[in-house]
């Protein structure tokens, strides 16, 4: 696994090459953003929209709540996320399942995700990103640190690592 932080300039120049690579893979057709009911997740949707534009694919937004918790999210925040998704021309789906990483992996595979966008794991993490990467190691995961001006850190699939090393992405 290669984890790299990309500057805006690298993302733009790299996005062209990635878009060319993706056009060869016809079964791949979306960027999937995984959100929780927090207003900070609007940044994830906006970052996911930029990534989807680089790839030239649609944006999908996913939120998975634990069944055992019932419907407890703040409805105002959830409505704001729906509006943000709508403004970015994305569909937003909400599911109730006690295995959110497994469900996200299944949806990513079914929709042919080229990139999965998540928040950056903090202390007391649920290990969502690690589990997701274990389940779909062939899909890039972009973690957005909303507390650090939206910096994006990427978990690069093994098969794509030589390309990233050639274009100068630095491992962290």
Per-range role (PLM):
Residues 60-62, 91-96, 142-144:
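General small-molecule cofactor/ligand-binding pocket signal
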Residues 46-48, 104-107, 128-132:
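A short acidic, amphipathic alpha-helical/loop segment
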Residues 1-25, 88-116, 122-124, 150, ...:
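Structural beta-alpha unit
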Residues 22-75, 82, 86:
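Small/aliphatic-rich secondary-structure junction motif
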Residues 52, 85, 108, 134-136:
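A generic structural signal for well-ordered alpha-helical segments
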Residues 56, 89, 112, 137-140:
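Residue-level detector of structured alpha->beta connecting loops
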């Amino acid at each position: 696994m290669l984890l790299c932080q990309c500057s805006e300039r690298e993302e733009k120049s790299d996005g062209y090459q990635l878009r060319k690579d993706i056009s060869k893979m016809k079964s791949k057709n979306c960027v999937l953003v995984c959100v929780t009911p927090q207003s900070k997740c609007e940044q994830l949707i906006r970052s996911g929209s930029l990534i989807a534009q680089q790839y030239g694919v649609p944006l999908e937004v996913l939120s998975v709540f634990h069944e055992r918790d019932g419907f407890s999210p703040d409805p105002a925040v959830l409505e704001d996320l729906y509006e943000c998704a709508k403004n970015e021309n994305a569909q937003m789906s909400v599911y109730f399942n006690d295995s959110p990483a497994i469900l996200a992996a299944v949806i990513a595979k079914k929709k042919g995700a080229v990139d999965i966008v998540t928040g950056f794991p903090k202390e007391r993490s649920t290990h969502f990103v690690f589990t997701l990467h274990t389940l779909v190691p062939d899909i890039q995961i972009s973690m957005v640190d909303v507390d650090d001006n939206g910096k994006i850190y990427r978990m690069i699939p093994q098969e794509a690592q030589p390309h990233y090393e050639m274009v100068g992405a630095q491992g962290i």
